[in-house]
């Protein structure tokens, strides 16, 4: 067990009241007891000054200044010192039993600012026999001594053997030594660390719960995970550097692209212009020869055009004269056609209206019959309704009478009276004065027979009435038809006129039937007449063209002569055509072959250029495609070998990277699962415990632990046993060692050390022999040594890999070039030169063109004669079939005769069309016109009389029937019989009344419905009559209009008129077409003559100019060629494939390149000026100068340390290979450097879990601490909700926020800050940058919230605040917090210092009077359990039972102040024991 270091003593030299005083410090509690002003605070101030000699922090205020920051100008230190040199020295024995003396030299600085000068120093190796006061003072005599200066102290110590004296210029160095030697618990690297330490001491000194510490518990208790932050910062710095390098590579690539672009565009700019001038020079020579040839050809063409112009002018004049006559004839034919079409439309209307009239006539007759029947029915309905009405009235009267007489006494009298009334009414109606009730039956039968007879007579008359009405309507219909055909006439004349009309209709129909044949005959004759006239016109025109008058009989002879002439000319023309065709075919073949060669020439030239480049790149000469393919196979083999070697080097480099990454893991854990298991089991990796082992001891410890060097050290194996059940995610062999990770040693094994090996006795029957490894990896030093070796090997491999990658890429590019050549140019690269063959073909083409021109001039005359003869034969072929027509003189008379007969037939057709339907209707009913049915009115009167007779007979029979019915009323047998009879009669009367009323209702309804129907029939009849009259009037008007037109409208009239018009239109169109052709030809001929004239003048002028231009351009071209050859750029500029482009294409190519070059050289003043000068089109040699300047500029920019060539094109090629390799390597490096968000979350979460476990262990040490009502103290650590959400998102939902972490514009810290803002938009980030926020989020301490809680009395656990606790409880709670902080610092710093050092623990407590005895005893117990030293300042009445107590009394003797000190150890013993060395040195 390592002993904890202790403060042995505190020495004050030349302090106020203390000249040279040494306080021996107790191992636990040292109490300074004394009254006010005794020097207790001064003693503690000296101790604190020696611990933290930082004037920016020191501020010794009394307790009345609590919370003040500027109580006095000197902050309490200047007034505690005396003038001169002062010392405050601490004597320490550390865990290694080394004596260390550390302290400060203080001296007041003169001036009103009351400043103090402090110099820290340290002494090592001082013998224990020498006291600090002996070093710091010099005894002058028995009563006097003086304080030595710092230089004197240094000289005194240097004289001692083995003693080291160190004076420090900075507080950081002073504290670094104190940390290394175990004086302070924490390495105080910065002012912030010193401030935390001072605040801790200050809080301990003045007691209570320090708000400064409680607010910053995270900074005090939680260690800064600087390794993680530094790893992230290094990663981001490496990524940033990597991206900057990539950006620089991209800039270099853009520069490379610019150079490549500059070369390409400069070559296009100059080469296009160079080849354009070369082409133009050749073209100008060809044009000069062509102009001279065209000049002679144009002169001959002008003479031929002048002769042609005279002939066409004569023919045009003839056509202009004939056009007027044709236009007049065509207009007359068009007008006649319009009249015929109008007459036909009128005829169609007439036929349509006649059909409508016939239909209306039939409908009108039908409607008249319907109306008559409806009127008869209406009269019958009225009679029935009237009879029904009378019967109902009669029955109602009878029923009313019987109802009135229903009284038993009056009924009989009433009925008897009614019977008498009925008898009288029957006598009156029947004219029978002798009628009695007994004879009524006989008379009833008589009158019923009379009624039957009257009814039969009425029905007979009704039938006769119907027949007469039908005859009357037929007569009227026949009469109307006769009147419609003949016009108005008397009724008695209708029969005679109708017979005459029928006989005339038969004749007219016969003539109408002949009209169609006459019309066909007339059409045929008219067609022949037109053909005759057309043949006469053609004959006249033929004679005009031939210039001679021919008879009809001479035409056949002339036709034979012309055919013979055509045959002879056709043979000559045919032979000429064959000869010309042969020449043209040969010429076309030459041209086709030339075009094929010209299309192939650029391809062949490109193939040759590519082949030359391959030869230059490979250093080989190729004569055939087979040699190229064989060399490609060699390249493939070479590339395969280089790739294999490169991959082997890359695999070795990756293996080294993985090993470096594995060795760089914190704690030496090669398996990340071991870290998780160590946290799970609450243990520490064995490699982490031995992380600080030296390089010399690493082989020993590596062999000592053997396979268990990766074991986990746990406090208790029994607690881990339960967790091992079901454990799967772990290495195959997991070693667990029980022990205290804080004080672990190698005593767990029995070991015998041999030469470079060890024998480990694991058990009585099991030993393990392990040799020292040649490459030990146990401990940080061994791993770092191995990492340095691996880094060196990796650098050499990287250089070899880069060289091999360059060679591979160069071989691949050469392979790609060969592959492109084989795929694109191998088929044509080794063929014959097409340009040589083109020159030969051009020579032969010139010979053929001259032969064709000579042949064309000879063949032209034969062709003209052939065309004239052929035209004459064509005209005769049209005339010869019409010779018979030309000889027929009677054709016109026959046409006139047929025309007259057709007119008569047309009149008959019109009569039949107009009256045919009427005659057809009249013929079957003409017989009814023989007699006029005038007796129809008498028949109507007889029918009305019969109806009246029938009604009278019906009334008489009814009256007699009533008498018969009332016959019982004339004699009654008795009252009962009379009553019964009355009841029966009453019932019968009621039934008859109901029947009569029903009959009356039906009669009325039938009459009403029939009246409405009759009205509808009458309306329809009136509408039909109106329509008939209207259409009749329109038909008459149409007949009148047709007569006014005066044109015969038969079926073929329109066709004949249209045919005539079309023939004239055709003749007019042909004439106009020919005239237009002649005018156009004449205009074209005149224009051609003008063009030829202008062309002659232009050709003469152009020929002279071209000849002068050829001569003048020769001098400039010679200068260009001289400049090109002198600078050796002809190979770059004379691009033969450009010779096959047109001048416009070359000029466009040069202009595009010029525009690109203006942008490319905008930043280069020299090239910009040269380019501007080269734009002069009259000075082509300046473009060559620009090209030479560009190449010179690029040669100067080539880095000879990287690229080994002077050619800019080859330099660009090598730059592309090198940049491609660097880009790929840096991209892979960036992917390796990048860290995932899930890994960040896991690292932070594991760190939080580890620190929570550590705080939990610290809480266990404070569970038994109690002060007053405070039973226990604990520290709560919770993760903030916002930060917990951030960790969850980073680990589980990071895919949703890849836009932040995959962005090249954001570092990981900035992306983390952006994500935090996105998840917590409600939090105001202030003016902090995302980088600052991200760095804070990488610190796990910002994820935690910490607060102190106390278990006080009945309140339970509450937050530790001064207002809720008593003063003593607050002091005790604050002291507990400070103890926890100190212990946390020790745990944090254990890995930073040696394993054999346990630092000193010491705290202060001023004004301990505020604590009771139990609280002070608790402090003593806490100090004993934690091995902590405590210095207490207490008043005189406080005397602890344990520890060392110093009684301080300040005295004044001869105006000289000094403090008298008496030291006592405890008060439990009866006799106090005085400590040695308590006499006052004063």
Swiss-Prot record:
Q: Which residues bind ATP?
A: 34-41
Q: Which Pfam families does UniProt cross-reference here?
A: MukB, MukB_hinge, SbcC_Walker_B
| Region Flexible hinge, annotated ranges | 666-783
| Coiled-coil blocks | 326-472, 507-602, 832-1110, 1209-1265
The Gene Ontology biological process terms listed for this entry are: cell division; chromosome condensation; chromosome segregation; DNA replication
Cellular component GO terms, alphabetically? cytoplasm; nucleoid
Q: Does the keyword Cell cycle apply?
A: yes
One MF term in the entry's GO annotations: ATP binding
Q: Where is the composition biased (Basic and acidic residues)?
A: 1056-1065
Tell me the keywords, alphabetical order: ATP-binding, Cell cycle, Cell division, Chromosome partition, Coiled coil, Cytoplasm, DNA condensation, DNA-binding, Nucleotide-binding
**Cited InterPro entries:** MukB (IPR012090), MukB/SMC (IPR050308), MukB_hinge (IPR032520), MukB_hinge_sf (IPR042501), MukB_N_dom (IPR007406), P-loop_NTPase (IPR027417)
Q: Where in the cell is it found?
A: Cytoplasm, Nucleoid
Q: Where is this region: Disordered?
A: 1056-1075
Q: Which SUPFAM superfamilies match?
A: P-loop containing nucleoside triphosphate hydrolases
Domain remark text: The hinge domain, which separates the large intramolecular coiled coil regions, allows the homodimerization, forming a V-shaped homodimer.
Describe the subunit structure.
Homodimerization via its hinge domain. Binds to DNA via its C-terminal region. Interacts, and probably forms a ternary complex, with MukE and MukF via its C-terminal region. The complex formation is stimulated by calcium or magnesium. Interacts with tubulin-related protein FtsZ.
NCBIfam families (alphabetical): PRK04863.1
Q: What does this protein do?
A: Plays a central role in chromosome condensation, segregation and cell cycle progression. Functions as a homodimer, which is essential for chromosome partition. Involved in negative DNA supercoiling in vivo, and by this means organize and compact chromosomes. May achieve or facilitate chromosome segregation by condensation DNA from both sides of a centrally located replisome during cell division.
What the record says about family reads: Belongs to the SMC family. MukB subfamily.
Name the UniProt record assigns to this protein = Chromosome partition protein MukB
The source organism is Klebsiella pneumoniae (strain 342)
Q: From which lineage does this chain's organism come?
A: Bacteria, Pseudomonadati, Pseudomonadota, Gammaproteobacteria, Enterobacterales
